[in-house]
Amino acid sequence: MVQKGSDKMPEVDAIRAQLFALQDKEYQIFNSRLMPTLPPETVIGVRVPLLRKLAKQLTDTPEAEVFVQDLPHFYYEENALHAFLLESVRDFGTALAETERFLPYVDNWAVCDSFSPKVFAQHKPELLTAIRRWLGSDQVYTVRYGIGMLMRYYLDDAFRPEYLAWAAAVHSEEYYVNMMRAWYFATALAKQPAAALPWLTEKRLDVWTHNKTIQKAVESRR
């Protein structure tokens, strides 16, 4: 793959060059097939551990500050790197604001599911307000992210049965939203069976989500 020409800031071009230096062309072919919503030419082919390592190296640098302001990104790996940089933001307000600024540009499941600022775990009550907002979004991956945050942070000690209703109330024709709903309910069956099981036994979910939830629950026990 030839690197796309750029009129970006020098800091952004430098980071893009670092990504291309980590390129694995065979992995690019493999990874492109896993993300059918993305044009193959927007995937460089950098493995996730290397992206996370680069994010760690760039954290708190002026280059990273310029990079995260430069939206939209062209390459999948630029979005993934941006997501991993957000994970290290230590102030909750900043992490939330930057996540909300970034979410409209997320265009695939891999970036959507890969990140959550660590500080979110320390502010679960405050995060719920944002999650409700995300669930009502008209952006596919913003909704998916909201359901993912419910699954990540609110199926253990912070669980409340009403959160199941929040996820069930999301109505969408989008595959990547509905798959996350099914994943959420399958995980809820494992972690909060008393609350989650009636959603299946009483057939409260739509048929597709009901069936996919059972499928994912069975697969997770293999």
Sequence positions of predicted segments:
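Alpha-helical scaffold domains
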Residues: 2-222
